[in-house]
Amino acid sequence: MTIEHAADAAPAGERSLAEMLCAARDEYGVEIRLARGGAQAAENYSRRIDRLVMRIYAAASSQAGTPVALLAIGGYGRRHLCLHSDIDLMILFGGPIAAAEERFVKALLHPLWDLGFDVGHQVRQLSELAQAETDNPGFLVAVGDSRFLTGDAGVFERFDTLVHGPESVWRQPTVEALFGLVAERHRHFNATIYQLEPDVKEAPGALRDVAAIRTFVALTQPGTARSVPATS
């Protein structure tokens, strides 16, 4: 058995990864049909996917030779997954990335690909984050919505201080990147065709703007992001 498929070898009495995913999607569908609220259903589904990802991590973790933390970023970080959303991950190593770490990354990602997920993944060494990646606005904004999934809590705490701490050099570049991406999207989706048939996700005032507002509040007023209501 190859290491990338070891995660799906369920112990006796446990569900396979495919069964876990199928059950998560079925439960999401039930919640939507019962009209329990889209935001809550998305959060519940995201938590179920968390458990699946954590299981894959647990099977792969012995491959890494240096401490590693796994983070959810972007929409997955906000727990806004829909049934067929991609999942955005940051694989953050506390030390050098060598052959063992590359094997770990493969062992983590291959089972997700095999399940049909579109995985957006960023691999970083903690020392690389001493400066904000100002040439990568999408990454800056995605990291603004990061949360810890599993792995080395110490690596995550150092990351959190670097990126979200009171003296972080990431905050202002991230705010600027957020404004730039919003303006670019508004220019595109404010065209006449979208006035006739608005895009409920991308258009001005639509779902991406709600997410942008929450991200902005989290960046500029830490601890108050939950005061901005989620959509339902």
Residue positions per predicted region:
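A nucleotide- and high-energy phosphate-metabolite-utilizing enzyme signature
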Residues: 1-232
